[in-house]
Regions:
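Right-hand nucleic-acid polymerase module
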Residues: 1-139, 150-295
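Cys/His-coordinated zinc-finger cores
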Residues: 143-147
Length: 295
């Protein structure tokens, strides 16, 4: 199916290569938040109904800017795609609150994970990890972690008998990623959207408010951390056709997917961008080389 949007082949683009995917955009893309529009630190407009609502946040810390968060999550998505596949492990680590007090100290959270990680490596050998903080409306933190063996695959890991005692701080969940898991997209939604009953007291409505969890991330917090062994996306800036050629593709190659983004800036003007994705780059490189050899 032909894409509705396409970058001109002679324009300058920012390109990222990760996990056999080539991503190109004519500028830094900014996703449009369609679920809510904040109008103050305490209120937002539900764009589906037009109603003004109040945030139910007990977390009083200064929030990060949405633009910085979206950039962070785009980088996080690329890291996930570059490093994790079917058979790797996804963990959720939470804190029990026996005294009703939320765990708000991120230094403690990362310190507790460091203790957990030493125990994990002692049992399973050299592994790589990527951990991500998830804020709750109460102000407390959860951790999500992706773990892979540096060589081979991890064996079956029992959540109740192994992971939960190893963590020792509260409820845990352990899942092995499947071929059908789009882990990057799922985790992005999990970390940015929030259930309606968590943010709107007493609501009987089901579902999530898109993007609402972004407003619980305080300024100055490092949202994710990864081990040194993770592969980092390769970033390039140049002419689109030249970058396609550099990765062994035809200068006229068509993207597998392309998306249009529009963003309003302070003076009322709009900035628009197109982002293209080329999947399975290595396979296409071999096909293109074979075609050239035949010619």
């Amino acid at each position: 199916m032909e894409n509705k949007y396409e970058l001109e082949k002679n324009i300058t683009v920012n390109a990222y290569y990760y996990g056999n995917v080539l991503e190109m955009t004519d500028t830094n893309p900014i996703s449009k938040q369609s679920g809510i529009r904040p109008i103050s630190k305490d209120e937002y407009i539900d764009l589906a109904t037009g109603m003004t609502m109040k945030f139910n946040h007990q977390n009083k810390q200064r929030i990060q800017s949405p633009e910085n968060l979206r950039k962070t999550f785009r980088n996080l998505r690329r890291l996930i795609i570059a490093n994790f596949n079917a058979g790797d492990i996804w963990l959720t680590l939470t804190y029990r609150q026996d005294d009703g007090r939320p765990i708000t100290d991120t230094k403690r959270v990362y310190r507790d994970f460091k203790v957990f990680w030493r125990r994990f490596v002692a049992r399973y050998g050299h592994c790589d990890y990527l951990i991500v903080l998830e804020p709750q409306a109460s102000g407390s933190w959860h951790l999500h972690g992706l773990i892979k063996k540096q060589k081979g695959k991890l064996p079956f890991i029992d959540n109740n008998l192994v992971v939960e005692p190893m963590w020792g701080q509260g409820f845990t969940m352990t899942k092995r990623l499947k071929d059908t898991d789009n882990v990057a997209s799922y985790l992005m939604a999990y970390l940015t959207d929030i259930p309606k009953d968590e943010i709107i007291p007493g609501t009987s409505k089901k579902g999530n408010i898109k993007g609402a969890r972004l407003h619980y991330y305080p300024s100055g917090v490092h949202i994710y951390r990864g081990s040194r062994g993770l592969r980092r996306p390769v970033k390039k800036k140049g002419v689109k056709s030249d970058i396609l050629f550099d990765y062994g593709l035809s200068r006229d190659a068509k993207a597998d997917a392309a998306f249009y983004h529009e963003h309003k800036i302070k003076n009322g003007k709009k900035i628009s961008h197109i982002t293209e994705f080329y999947d399975n780059v290595n396979n296409k490189k071999e096909t293109n080389q074979a075609r050239q050899d035949h010619d």
